Amino acid sequence: MAEKHFFLGVEAIWASPRMCDLFAQVRRIAQSALPVVLLGESGSGREVIARALHYYSPRRPKPFVDLSCGSLPANLIEAELFGYDRRSLTAPHSTRSGLLELAHEGTLFLNEIGSLAPRAEARLLQTFDASHSLGFVRQSHSNVRIIAATSSPSSAQRLYSALSARKTVELLEIPPLRERPEDIEALACHFLSQQNPELRFASGAMTALYAYLWPGNVRELRNTVLRSALLSKGPLLHADDILFSPAVPGACAGVAGLEPALIRQALADSGGRLQRAADSLGISRHALSRKIRFYGLNTTTLIERISA
């Protein structure tokens, strides 16, 4: 059964046990004021998780301010975060409040922090110690909860270690869509109803959606469904009607071709035990059974070979 929630104007839908567990962690962590590091691929829902953390927290009535660090030159990071005063600059700029001040008593979400240069990242880390207005000797401390997100495991670990040296910090990992296939149908049907409530998926179309690896995650699924619905000519979307991203399928197909072999290996390693094999692959038993049927894998023959 899919769950649907709204967090600060952003809709979130999930049906998989992994996302249920993740949002249970979100509700628990939201009650504290601890900084949070989010690790998740592009399009996996990092902003949704950040907004949910703010929504469930006591800071909910206060501002939620977000900044995409990857779109900002390193030399502007400090001015954006701390603000500036014209007395500290040679150019005739007026005084401007920084994002830390704007987010006072609320939440500051720093997305794509892994794309920052080391020097800029070091400046950001200073915000966890003290915040000040650029050009002022006097320091003014801000009461802000900071959530930092990245798609790079190494960046997440580096940031987590750096923050842990200063204070307790939480780390949340957002699973990619390919590791929670139970969410594909719920999300796809939702996106389709948004675009055209009269359209439905044929069984073959849903099979095609399940077989795709979704390197762009939920964002790519949404764009694929909307694009396919716009060009649909009938009441049903069939497998041939699904318009996958033209930039990705070749690479994706190469990875997808490895999946049957990975499943066979997991079954062999687990002695044919589906639950153990599913756990090793990071998916549910239901998802594994569906993939076995899709690829036409003969598990009986495989188990007999293992036992021989």
Named regions from a protein language model:
Residues 59-80:
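AAA+/P-loop NTPase substrate/partner-engagement loops
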Residues 18, 95, 258-262:
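N-terminal positioning helix adjacent to the helix-turn-helix/winged-helix DNA-binding module
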Residues 2-20, 24-31, 41, 50, ...:
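Nucleotide-binding/hydrolysis machinery
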Residues 36, 45, 51, 223, ...:
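Bacterial C-terminal helix-turn-helix
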Residues 11, 92, 138, 255-256, ...:
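Residue-level marker of regulatory loop/turn positions in helix-turn-helix DNA-binding domains and
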